[in-house]
């Protein structure tokens, strides 16, 4: 779940 947030960075 959290990984999806970092993938946009």
Swiss-Prot record:
The keyword Lyase applies. The keyword Cytoplasm applies. It catalyses: 4-imidazolone-5-propanoate = trans-urocanate + H2O. Keywords: Cytoplasm, Histidine metabolism, Lyase, NAD. It comes from Klebsiella aerogenes. GO terms for biological process: L-histidine catabolic process to glutamate and formamide; L-histidine catabolic process to glutamate and formate. Binds 1 NAD(+) per subunit. The lineage of its organism: Bacteria, Pseudomonadati, Pseudomonadota, Gammaproteobacteria, Enterobacterales. Belongs to the urocanase family. GO terms for molecular function: urocanate hydratase activity. Its cofactor is NAD(+). GO terms for cellular component: cytoplasm. Pathway: Amino-acid degradation; L-histidine degradation into L-glutamate; N-formimidoyl-L-glutamate from L-histidine: step 2/3. Its EC number is 4.2.1.49. Catalyzes the conversion of urocanate to 4-imidazolone-5-propionate. This is Urocanate hydratase. It is found in: Cytoplasm.
């Amino acid at each position: 779940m959290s990984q999806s947030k970092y993938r946009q960075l």
